[in-house]
Amino acid sequence: MASGELACRYAALILSDDGIAITAEKIATIVKAANIKVESYWPALFAKLLEKRNVEDLILSVGSGGGAAPVAAAAPAGGAAAAAAPAVEEKKEEAKEESDDDMGFSLFD
């Protein structure tokens, strides 16, 4: 990760924490005050990204999407999703039945 990108992230967090509107000029001012050299496009890029989004919402939603993404990508559309769900449940039940039969008492199988 580039240090310029990280500096702009921190500057945006500082502005958001103080309740100040996030603009490219303000991000550049904070980065300049920290004596960090940043490419000129980073402050504008972050300002454009964050003008439509709330920083607090982004922070709160960081961990909420991790496990759901693979399931959503694998799920078929429409009525096929309902048909696929029972098939998955049946496979889980079969695995439980097999594991109940073999309790691990035979050491040399």
From Swiss-Prot:
Protein name: Large ribosomal subunit protein P1
Record bears the keyword Lipid metabolism: no
Residue ranges of the region described as Disordered: 85-109
PTM remark: Phosphorylated. The N-terminus is blocked.
GO biological process assignments: cytoplasmic translation; translational elongation
Pfam families documented for this protein: Ribosomal_60s
Keywords: Phosphoprotein, Ribonucleoprotein, Ribosomal protein
Gene (UniProt): RPP1A
Keyword Ribonucleoprotein part of the UniProt annotation: yes
Family: Belongs to the eukaryotic ribosomal protein P1/P2 family.
